[in-house]
Amino acid sequence: MSKQRKKADLATVLRKSWYHLRLSVRHPTRVPTWDAIVLTAASPEQAELYDWQLRRAKRMGRIASSTVTLAVPDPDGKRIGSGAATLNAIYALARHYEKLGFDLGPEMEVANGACKWVRFISAKHVLMLHAGGDSKRVPWANPMGKVFLPLPYLAADDPDGPVPLLFDHILAIASCARQAFQDQGGLFIMTGDVLPCFDAFKMTLPEDAASIVTVPITLDIASNHGVIVTSKSESLAESYTVSLVNDLLQKPTVEDLVKKDAILHDGRTLLDTGIISARGRAWSDLVALGCSCQPMILELIGSKKEMSLYEDLVAAWVPSRHDWLRTRPLGELLVNSLGRQKMYSYCTYDLQFLHFGTSSEVLDHLSGDASGIVGRRHLCSIPATTVSDIAASSVILSSEIAPGVSIGEDSLIYDSTVSGAVQIGSQSIVVGIHIPSEDLGTPESFRFMLPDRHCLWEVPLVGHKGRVIVYCGLHDNPKNSIHKDGTFCGKPLEKVLFDLGIEESDLWSSYVAQDRCLWNAKLFPILTYSEMLKLASWLMGLDDSRNKEKIKLWRSSQRVSLEELHGSINFPEMCNGSSNHQADLAGGIAKACMNYGMLGRNLSQLCHEILQKESLGLEICKNFLDQCPKFQEQNSKILPKSRAYQVEVDLLRACGDEAKAIELEHKVWGAVAEETASAVRYGFREHLLESSGKSHSENHISHPDRVFQPRRTKVELPVRVDFVGGWSDTPPWSLERAGYVLNMAITLEGSLPIGTIIETTNQMGISIQDDAGNELHIEDPISIKTPFEVNDPFRLVKSALLVTGIVQENFVDSTGLAIKTWANVPRGSGLGTSSILAAAVVKGLLQISNGDESNENIARLVLVLEQLMGTGGGWQDQIGGLYPGIKFTSSFPGIPMRLQVVPLLASPQLISELEQRLLVVFTGQVRLAHQVLHKVVTRYLQRDNLLISSIKRLTELAKSGREALMNCEVDEVGDIMSEAWRLHQELDPYCSNEFVDKLFEFSQPYSSGFKLVGAGGGGFSLILAKDAEKAKELRQRLEEHAEFDVKVYNWSICI
């Protein structure tokens, strides 16, 4: 596989996974999510940090509110091994549920391994991440926990959102694996220092068994890792295979692999990825063991032994390993408790393994194949290029950089404040540093420099007011002995000490020679900030090495080692400092947006971050709220009122004033209606509100004939189905940005289903009748006024009378009108029925009054009509019904808004193929478009970046769909429909439901693509079959299937 292909695959897998994660968090009843997420930690203090991070993830929408989260430390901070930690975590989860009030009876104590508790936990779907321990090779990540290090993949998709972390991406990948468990409870285990990029949607897990994810790997890599030996059922033609596990090997030689028959026919072997699952009975057995594991763990601690997950615990599911396992600590118990079930290998051939085991690997993942999806600037404050020197390839996240700073290529700066007179080299990592400019003096007196390939970070310590500054070389391995390749800042540690005049006894008083290494060297002084920076320069070899003053200061100072630091981190202080720092950054960005910008940022999201400062944050939000009237006044000519009002609504909510926010929302929607009217017909608002008979409309009837003349008009129109592009036609998007929609006019069951008959009558007033038997006679047409009642069945016709000017222009002074309407399609169809019926009525009224009945004029008037009705909506429905055939329509903002309809000259072959392969299916699910529409428009007015990027993508797909249809590439149209459907669910997860999901899942083997038409939520669906035969087969299966009470309609393109 080429590097280019890998990069594309990584982006595709991550985007799909993130889409699914967001969907499962926003609508967990429809898209199942984890019942519990559990992290293992090395100590109670680290567990507190992880709990804080888990709360953050919930607050940021990474974890569903219904999911139980828990961080579980090793007992008393003693190392017990990953296998025992797994059992301990299961026990802790059961106890946690007990504390949450899940009372299963007075005699039911978890510690007794009670059957009811085992049954209760066994029904749960649990994600477990092993994230405990120290990270000697990525020491700067120890304070935050390596699993929470920053990984800004796809960060640009949501520039006002939090910086994505490795943990967030792991959650995204894992969210797709949840479907493999279906309704059977289970456990899914991952490790905290690896991001396994693969399409977990495809994952298959055998029932009542354990499984391990594997990937084919070359023998040289396999020799340093775990290898899985399976039964010979691999078929490399498939993207994955499921096979019974026969044996487990640890760091095998080539001879071992040959002897155990572990080499595949292509010369590779199966790597153990560390992703393990247990489902059904295998999970129940594990829960039963976990609920009664405490005596076993005490025995391990007493004997100072460990139980590994990857060697010991999984061996219980592999019969060939049982004899070996019985020789291990508690091995007999594992075999007896778990050995009844089997383990399978789920081998996925396209898995990419991003390992974060060293600092250099972290930087590699930001500058290598994946660099195209890396957000290099996120939630940061950066000076102008004329007063700083910051490399374009550097990654700056949640940081404030002052003028006068220099940052080299491919460096990572995270959660820091870097003041002037600081120079950071290339390929360096700076984390949690807050350099106060007043401590540095002038650049002439002292300029701090961090050389190339170095790491620099700060740690708050328990029992100390200040922080300690820590540093090392990017490639230093703190585990290496001083006498065996041990380095500091990239140089041999022995030589560094000799050059500086430091004795080994200064660093190690209680360690024997072979155990002396950077990890346990008491190297880092705790002094004032400026003293620590100056000594850092000296220790890194940037200063006079034999400076007596500095070595004296260093020797006399209290010093700590990396090891001691790891056990003394003040986690609450660190979390609080990080929250305040990010709140300050968000506040600065929001302030700049209001003072210098046009409210282009998502202030709702930024305020969410600002409020982490609690009372201080609330004051900041109140100050922003106070600025709103002045801001609106200054920018009234160029800032849409709808956006200005929405900002005020968001700030009222941030300040806790929900009542005022709800009250102001009416102004938001009023402004959208007003802006729409202004854009589609210049001067329309004045025309609508004018009480005199004088008209400013194009449809002005200058001399209405007072003598009654009988006239009758009948308008019949098709319905529309949309392939892609919907939402880009909807105000206020279409008033501010270009919109593109690809749709098609069709007949149903051989007829045009939507129509109206309008005729003049001798009886004064207006009579309205619909196909539901509702009738109304309006004696005085001037009495028709907005707003209309939501449940008024005649508000569509009343709005049509207003927008066409029939009432205002005295047309009904000399004649009465009888209006009859019908729509022979199910209610809530999604076929644009309401808009197309409105178009039919508007067209009929303009015909009978000699108005401008051009399709473009009608389309614009219907836009205004829908705003008057309060339903909102865009132009694509009326365009779809008014213009025949398949068309690609563009809209361009302006006053008036410009519409450009381009009919696609479809060949007879294309028409025939579409009519044979495309199924138009009524789902039977009633939908209300305005409910979906309200949510989507609100998110757009908030400048929700994920929504904006989704609609932009829909417009790009509309252009691609046009090309595909013109080239008769119908399969590609199916792919486009399916991606459009995913994006629609990104816009609003409630645009689908479980029934629709099941319908599409059932149709998947027969189809190239599918989607609900219109805004979704129910109504009609389009299913593009793989070919004509598959279409016939699917139609028959759907009509016969008892679970699906759906109707497949006969249709044809309305030419």
Curated annotation (Swiss-Prot):
PANTHER family: L-FUCOSE KINASE. It comes from Arabidopsis thaliana (Mouse-ear cress). The keyword Translocase does not apply. Its EC number is 2.7.7.30, 2.7.1.52. Residues 693-1055 are annotated as: L-fucokinase. Belongs to the GHMP kinase family. It holds the Pfam family GHMP_kinases_N. It is an enzyme of class 2 (transferase). Optimum temperature is 40 degrees Celsius for the L-fucokinase activity and 30-45 degrees Celsius for the GDP-fucose pyrophosphorylase activity. Residues 34-565 are annotated as: GDP-fucose pyrophosphorylase. Keywords: ATP-binding, Carbohydrate metabolism, Kinase, Magnesium, Manganese, Metal-binding, Multifunctional enzyme, Nucleotide-binding, Transferase. The L-fucokinase activity absolutely requires divalent cations such as Mn(2+) and Mg(2+). Optimum pH is 10.5 for the L-fucokinase activity and 6.5-8 for the GDP-fucose pyrophosphorylase activity. It catalyses: L-fucose + ATP = beta-L-fucose 1-phosphate + ADP + H(+); beta-L-fucose 1-phosphate + GTP + H(+) = GDP-beta-L-fucose + diphosphate. GO terms for biological process: GDP-L-fucose salvage. Disruption phenotype: No visible phenotype and no alteration of the sugar composition of cell wall polysaccharides, but accumulation of free L-fucose. ATP binds at P826, R827, G828, S829, G830, L831, G832, T833, S834, S835, I836. GO terms for molecular function: ATP binding; fucokinase activity; fucose-1-phosphate guanylyltransferase activity; metal ion binding. Ubiquitous. Highest expression in flower buds. This is Bifunctional fucokinase/GDP-fucose pyrophosphorylase. InterPro entries: GDP_fucose_pyrophosphorylase, GHMP_Kinase-Related, GHMP_kinase_C_dom, GHMP_kinase_C_sf, GHMP_kinase_N_dom, Ribosomal_Su5_D2-typ_SF. Its cofactor is Mn(2+); Mg(2+). Bifunctional enzyme involved in the salvage pathway which converts free L-fucose to GDP-L-fucose. Catalyzes two successive reactions, the ATP-dependent phosphorylation of L-fucose to L-fucose 1-phosphate, and its guanylylation to GDP-L-fucose. The sugar-1-kinase activity has a strict substrate specificity for L-fucose and ATP. The pyrophosphorylase activity has a strict substrate specificity for L-fucose 1-phosphate and GTP. Gene3D superfamilies: 3.30.230.120.
